[in-house]
Amino acid sequence: MSDIALTVSVLALVAVVGLWIGNIKVRGVGFGIGGVLFGGIIVGHFVDQAGMTLSGDMLHFIQEFGLILFVYTIGIQVGPGFFASLRVSGLRLNLFAVLIVIMGGLVTAILHKIFAIPLPVVLGIFSGAVTNTPALGAGQQILRDLGTPVDLVDQMGMSYAMAYPFGICGILLTMWLMRLIFRVNVEAEAQKHESSLANGHSLIQTMNIRVENPNLNNMAIQDVPILNSDKIICSRLKRDDTLMVPSPGTIIQAGDLLHLVGQSTDLHNAQLVIGKEVDTSLSTRGTDLRVERVVVTNEKVLGKRIRDLHFKERYDVVISRLNRAGVELVATSDASLQFGDILNLVGRPASIDAVANVVGNAQQKLQQVQMLPVFIGIGLGVLLGSIPLFVPGFPVALKLGLAGGPLIIALILGRIGSIGKLYWFMPPSANLALRELGIVLFLAVVGLKSGGNFVNTLTQGEGLSWIGYGIFITAIPLITVGLLARIFAKMNYLTLCGMLAGSMTDPPALAFANNLHATSGAAALSYATVYPLVMFLRIITPQLLAVIFWGIG
């Protein structure tokens, strides 16, 4: 059997064993995709015992390409919400998550200096303790750029594997500890979260208002400032028994019922100006109007603003909401359409069908992947990651590397959405498939390289002390920030659990947090809010630590 065939066969075996290990769960918690690392260690141990030789160049390529696929697809997935998560609504959550990352780096630095832990080993412990595989890849990349011998770089994977198990268990223990210390009633926390959402500014809501302000009688909608703003959409108007779709020139009269869409505060302000909120239904049932959701798939409208498409004027159709990457937004006139946007339309059936034809609404296109943008994005990411940044006092140029470059490019492209006929939307199923393939390939190679000496290191070497160092890196930041967030910020327990899971980019921890309350989305919401920024910082941190400690010795 050729070296290539043997290498591929061994990698396939690693994937099978590792994914099987990852599917083993104890009380609903398992290693997940991280099981591939341990599958690689097991297979690597027996490969070493058997004296088999695998293709080193091929393993290196597969490891790096797998990492590129993984971080690129993550960036494309979270790109649309990344910059939004940095705004005020998620600022507090992101600040606490960033504090966890910074504290983890500081604890790592202190351990490195006090116990003289070799740099590759301590970076591996850090990556495993925070259960972040891209951090491992970024650390190995910068160590190679610094000229670290290959055998020492491979130690990073071994120390990562030592620290990884408690990295997963540690966050679950922290959640349990917070619940015990503060005697948390999970059901009450879920109700508080729902109440805060109802009174907050983050959810798009609706309100039916009767026009009672005499100053508005016989005025056009476009002449009423509160109705002619990008904060409020008037999607339906009912006069007597007639329900209609209003246009900017529609004249409103006293007694008209308006169906408004917007954020809670804006709706309240509109109600103060217009009249009284009523419980009267403005449902389209039994009328010649209907509400329908259509998806943007036509390349000709990508990047165009809603106002430039003139849906109200041409088709008598109102876009009441816009859903982008799972986030409900007010469909402002300045909003530019992106591939995969879901529009909530109100109008007559024939008019809605006409608008659907304009925007595409081709569901099958959502399942297709444009491969050209994928490779353009990967190529740009690799180029960006290879650009040297010369910093005075550092022995080598700082680079984003094969982990940071593709991630940043993917975040930007995911936010842009499309350029001309090229769109960077990727169907969730395709994104997940490429992401899982990438991380499986990466972890399989890391495990194989670590497996030969893993048992000896654990039983006869410093493996146990590495595990101890990892416990400090995992536990100190999580417990400290958890206490601060709960005591001083009065953070909701479910939100706190999601933030802790997101700060470690740990899906098994998110699954555990979600299972705390079956119907609450608090944990998932906070996880998604901090995940993009934390993932970026987790990739950058080991590179900064490596360059700093290499420079100061």
From Swiss-Prot:
Single GO molecular function: monoatomic cation transmembrane transporter activity
Membrane-protein topology: Multi-pass membrane protein
Entries under InterPro entries matching the protein: AAE_transporter (IPR050144), RCK_C (IPR006037), RCK_C_sf (IPR036721), Transpt_YidE_put (IPR023018), YidE_YbjL (IPR006512)
Entry-linked Gene3D superfamilies: Regulator of K+ conductance, C-terminal domain (3.30.70.1450)
Keyword Amino-acid biosynthesis recorded: no
Keyword check for Transport: yes
UniProt-recorded name of the protein: Putative transport protein YidE
Keywords: Cell membrane, Membrane, Repeat, Transmembrane, Transmembrane helix, Transport
PROSITE patterns xref list: RCK_C
GO cellular component: plasma membrane
Biological source species: Salmonella arizonae (strain ATCC BAA-731 / CDC346-86 / RSK2980)
GO biological process, one term: potassium ion transport
Upper taxonomic lineage: Bacteria, Pseudomonadati, Pseudomonadota, Gammaproteobacteria, Enterobacterales
Ranges where the RCK C-terminal domain occurs: 192-276, 279-361
Main localisation: membrane
Transmembrane regions listed in the UniProt entry: 4-24, 28-48, 65-85, 95-115, 158-178, 371-391, 403-425, 437-457, 464-484, 533-553
Family: Belongs to the AAE transporter (TC 2.A.81) family. YidE subfamily.
Subcellular location: Cell membrane
